[in-house]
Amino acid sequence: MLAASGPGCKRGAVGPAGRSLYIHSVINLPRIPLLLGLLLLGGPAFGACADSPAPGVVWRRCLLDNADFSGRDLTGAILRDTSFARARFVEAKLAGIDGSDARFSFADMSRADLTGATLRSTDLTRAVLAAATLKGADLRRATLFRADLRGADLTGAELTGANLSGADFSGARWLDGEKICGAGSIGSCQ
């Protein structure tokens, strides 16, 4: 996250932890080459990454590792290409998010509502999704290597091409909504 102060800075949005953020003004001439370079190289848009967590927020190519969004409402948010490694989303409302190509490795998303979420090609390596609701979620080509999905609801989820190696599905409600995976369901529902 950007945090700066001094001449040429304007008070920005409140960050995920409730801290005020200061973002350099584009009027500050020495900053223009830096901003243009980041835009041309596809770097993060600072204003968007500093936006407060809220329904429909757009965070693209942001670095939000270790952030705590527990209990927050991010319904319908655009989180594409963003890194949330080791972030906390316990009991967060994430229904309808687009987290395609995002990184949630080691994130704690236990009891989160991910109904209808798009998580195509998303890295969920060792993520904790215990008791999470993933009804109708699109997890095509997602990496769920050693993810904890114990007790999760996967009714209607799409897992085509997903890496499920070592994922724990014990007690999870499987794709058809009828089958409950048995204890020790590692890598597949048994």
Please annotate each region the language model reported.
Residues 7-11, 38:
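Hydrophobic residues within membrane-embedded alpha helices
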Residues 1-2, 9, 22-25:
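Short terminal hydrophobic/aromatic SLiMs and anchors at protein ends
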Residues 10-13, 28:
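Intrinsically disordered, low-complexity polyampholyte segments enriched for Lys and acidic residues
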Residues 3-4, 13, 17:
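Ala/Thr-enriched low-complexity intrinsically disordered regions
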Residues 21-34:
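Bacterial N-terminal signal peptides that target proteins for export
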Residues 42-44:
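N-terminal signal peptide c-region/cleavage motif recognized by signal peptidases
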Residues 46-190:
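Tandem repeat scaffolds
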